[in-house]
Curated annotation (Swiss-Prot):
Belongs to the UPF0127 family. NCBIfam families: PRK03760.1. HAMAP family: UPF0127. This is UPF0127 protein PF1050. Gene3D superfamilies: Protein of unknown function DUF192.
């Protein structure tokens, strides 16, 4: 996973939640050891909302628009809900520390490969 704006890269497995079931389950009941990228049908705020139901630990969540520019980010704790401040087309969920490792800030552009 690469922060194009800052030139920072981390090597981590990337998986996609590109259908309803994968988006519904997300990282529930799992320890996050990889990055899960949600591909939403539309760029929206409400449909980009996330929850920490049945999560075992906090995760980093990054919201991106259709240009893969960061529009919001948060640390999602178990059993909490979060609605991004701006519409998102992609949601990146990963283990705590991803945001810091990539020095991610709103406005940065991210890139990824299916598997690294």
């Amino acid at each position: 996973m690469l922060n194009v704006t800052k030139g920072k890269e981390i090597r981590i497995e990337v998986r996609f939640a590109d259908n309803f079931i994968k988006r519904f389950l997300g990282l529930m009941f799992r320890k996050p050891r990889y990055v899960l990228i949600f591909v939403l049908p539309l760029e929206t705020r409400i449909n980009a909302s996330v929850h920490g139901l049945f999560m075992r630990e906090a995760i980093d969540v990054i919201f991106l628009n259709s240009n893969k520019e960061v529009v919001d980010l948060t640390v999602l704790k178990p059993w909490r809900f979060y609605v991004p401040k701006r519409p998102a087309k992609y949601i990146v969920e990963g283990p705590r520390g991803i945001i810091e490792a990539l020095s991610v800030e709103v406005g940065d552009r991210l890139e990824w490969n299916r598997m690294i």
